């Protein structure tokens, strides 16, 4: 409940609107949001057969876009993300990000750029190794 969050220190802002349980409101807000529907690891799901078809996560990648890269290959396969910002509640617990490595993020971006240019669907370094 929103009232519990407010009683326990949550500061009232626009983000609280994502917690409103109203199908019409959620549908409208998902429709008007300016963010693109993308695959993000914190709140994603797919059919197992689709994940297998793209060979899962590229295990050469690390934090900093590895989830987006999987979603981009699903997109290349013809699987499109849905915008559910206001339909599927997701709360994030703050944590330090000591594992962030700029060089690894640059590598991830390079792989994503290659995949987009060449319409890559299946990774060689995923569930099944080639």
Task: Describe these PLM feature segments.
Residues 43, 82-83:
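A residue-level structural signature of the nucleotidyltransferase/glycosyltransferase Rossmann-like core
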Residues 47, 54-62:
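Conserved nucleotide-sugar donor-binding catalytic segment
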Residues 84-101:
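Active-site donor/metal-binding and catalytic loop motifs
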Residues 1-11, 80:
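Conserved donor NDP-sugar-binding/catalytic core segment of glycosyltransferases
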Residues 63-70:
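Acidic donor-binding loop at a coil-to-helix junction in glycosyltransferase catalytic cores
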Residues 9-19, 23-45:
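A recurrent flexible, glycine/aromatic-enriched loop bordering the glycosyltransferase active site
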Residues 80, 103-130:
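Terminal low-complexity segments of carbohydrate-biosynthetic enzymes
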Residues 74-75:
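Hydrophobic residues within well-ordered alpha-helices
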């Amino acid at each position: 409940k929103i009232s519990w969050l407010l009683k326990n220190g949550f500061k009232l802002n626009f983000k609280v609107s994502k917690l409103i349980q109203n199908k019409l409101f959620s549908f409208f807000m998902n429709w008007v949001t300016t963010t693109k529907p993308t695959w993000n690891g914190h709140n994603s799901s797919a059919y197992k057969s689709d994940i297998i078809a793209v060979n899962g996560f590229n295990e050469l990648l690390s934090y900093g876009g590895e989830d987006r890269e999987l979603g981009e290959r699903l997109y290349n396969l013809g699987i499109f993300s849905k915008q559910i910002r206001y339909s599927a509640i997701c709360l994030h617990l703050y944590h330090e990000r000591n594992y962030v490595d700029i060089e690894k993020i640059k590598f991830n971006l390079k792989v994503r750029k290659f995949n987009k240019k060449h319409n890559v669907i299946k990774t060689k370094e995923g569930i099944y190794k080639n």
